[in-house]
Amino acid sequence: MQKTNKFLKIGNKEFKSRLLVGTGKYSSLEVMQKSLINTKCEIVTVAVRRVQGLEHGHKGLMESIDWKRIWMLPNTAGCSNAEEAIRIARLGRELAKLAGQETNNFVKLEVIPDKKYLLPDPIGTLKAAEQLVKEGFTVLPYINSDPLIAKQLEEIGCATVMPLGSPIGSAQGIRNAANIAMIIAESRIPIIIDAGIGVPSEAAQALEMGADGVLINSAIALAENPILMAQAFSKATEAGRDGYLSGRLKENPLASPSSPLDGVISNN
Ligand SMILES: CC(=O)[C@@H](O)[C@H](O)COP(=O)(O)O
């Protein structure tokens, strides 16, 4: 289904920016702040567990983001089963309240038992999502690029699905484009490509394919110059969306001359 909405609509909120960003792995809070500004993002995800535990890089994080301008997307990173994820989602809602976002019921649902590839558990994700939807959360589940689980999550009331391009932090880009294309074609909710994007052109690729947004963390935070890379991702996301809306030239197995051949003076 072609989605031509001007804004990214998640639940009942609209966003101009289609680039969502993470807050982990930055060399300092100052670099993170400057990078976030350059992304022009309006949604920032925070790991509830890491913020609460004041883990490395997370002390002072809450205070360093302008929550009047940025919509918080609490995430359940570090949860390996549905029960933990539900508990952390509830804490995330309280965190958003503390930041002054009384009506924020968003949660980026991550249920990740696999420490090596950080792949999400589809059964645990579905179970947690069902409960969180019942509790009134706007649920954005992180999933493998599986069209069936994407559809099931849509049917139980998730606000988006967030299929991975490749494993978190791997910078391998979009390794599963065919499956992602199926998810995009079949969904009636926004699709946000989350994880594994390595360079801005891959963010553009996701948007060109018809994804509604991308979520980037490592490729910005761990770039040699994160502040400049943030800007590059912002431009790439916008370019990819414009490319999608413009309607691409269809691929052709044959060449097609750039100038008309009719009326050309013959050699004979
Ligand atoms: C911050 C966050 O939510 C990550 O778990 C997310 O999946 C981003 O992945 P990359 O770090 O690969 O961009």
UniProtKB/Swiss-Prot annotation:
Pathway(s) served: Cofactor biosynthesis; thiamine diphosphate biosynthesis
Active-site residues per Swiss-Prot or TrEMBL entry: K108 (schiff-base intermediate with dxp)
Broadest EC class assigned to this enzyme: transferase
GO cellular component, one term: cytoplasm
Residue ranges with Polar residues bias: 255-268
Subcellular locations according to the entry: Cytoplasm
Record keywords, A-Z: Cytoplasm, Schiff base, Thiamine biosynthesis, Transferase
Record-level Gene Ontology MF annotations: thiazole synthase activity
Enzyme Commission (EC) number: 2.8.1.10
Residue ranges of the region described as Disordered: 248-268
Positions that bind 1-deoxy-D-xylulose 5-phosphate: G169, A195, G196, N217, S218
Reactions that this protein is recorded to catalyse: [ThiS sulfur-carrier protein]-C-terminal-Gly-aminoethanethioate + 2-iminoacetate + 1-deoxy-D-xylulose 5-phosphate = [ThiS sulfur-carrier protein]-C-terminal Gly-Gly + 2-[(2R,5Z)-2-carboxy-4-methylthiazol-5(2H)-ylidene]ethyl phosphate + 2 H2O + H(+)
GO biological process, one term: thiamine diphosphate biosynthetic process
InterPro entries for the chain: Aldolase_TIM (IPR013785), Thiazole_synthase_ThiG (IPR033983), ThiG (IPR008867)
Family: Belongs to the ThiG family.
Function, as annotated: Catalyzes the rearrangement of 1-deoxy-D-xylulose 5-phosphate (DXP) to produce the thiazole phosphate moiety of thiamine. Sulfur is provided by the thiocarboxylate moiety of the carrier protein ThiS. In vitro, sulfur can be provided by H(2)S.
Known partners and oligomeric status: Homotetramer. Forms heterodimers with either ThiH or ThiS.
Protein name: Thiazole synthase
Gene name of the record: thiG
